[in-house]
Amino acid sequence: VPSSAGISSTVVNDTIVIPYNSPEALERVLKSREVACFIVEPVMENIGICLSDEGYLQQVREITQRYGTLLIFDEVKTGITASWGGATGAVGVTPDLVALAKSIGGGLPLGAFGGKQELMDLITEGKVVHLGTYNGNPLCMAAAKAVLSEVCTPATTDLTIARNTLLVNAVSEIINDASLPAHVVKFGAKGCVTWAEKQIRNYRDYKATDFDLAFAQWIHGINRGVLLPPGLDEQWLISVMHTDADALHYADVFDAFVQELTA
């Protein structure tokens, strides 16, 4: 499934796309050839929010271990928005490597990765080169330290997730009362309205959702002070600065949209 122009044949030849939530597809690929690593979002968040099936990630962990393939969690989108331990902590599956960004920087540009000792030793021993002009940038490092120790503490993170649950429940009730072909998906402090009756399980499911209604909802919200990201593939995020009233304001605006939609 192409995502952008400009993807070279070399990248295509070195990459195998495996459908999310399909351990059978993963097993077929790893059984047929040698694969260095399997990179997966524990919860997909560039298609709204696509949750993993029950037991899927546990199966992925078992399959990759059996075939000697590294398991890498892409937590650029999830991170501490999922829980203080990230999506890795929330789902209870430990990968070999994890990539982080966005939320850990507190608004400053920051990316990080970490993993098992034997893998990180490849860098410290000079066997794998890891260079970057802004690696270890003091300003970004100070911000990350403050975020993780002073701002997004375990208690504060739990509070934002509880506040998101308040919003999710309110929006779900509106959808159910109006019998709309939509549903709400929640993970940690994030949520979204997906305009489809059934929960999506992969990228192809997401492409079949109603983007016209999603765009109409976005425009309606923008004109009433609800500033969601412009990409229809994004989510809302409850931050430590939001209050219960802020969360329920979104629900009120969504309710107004539904009233206009069904009038």
Language model features with spans:
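Conserved N-terminal phosphate-binding loop of PLP-dependent enzymes in the Aspartate aminotransferase
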Residues: V1-A263
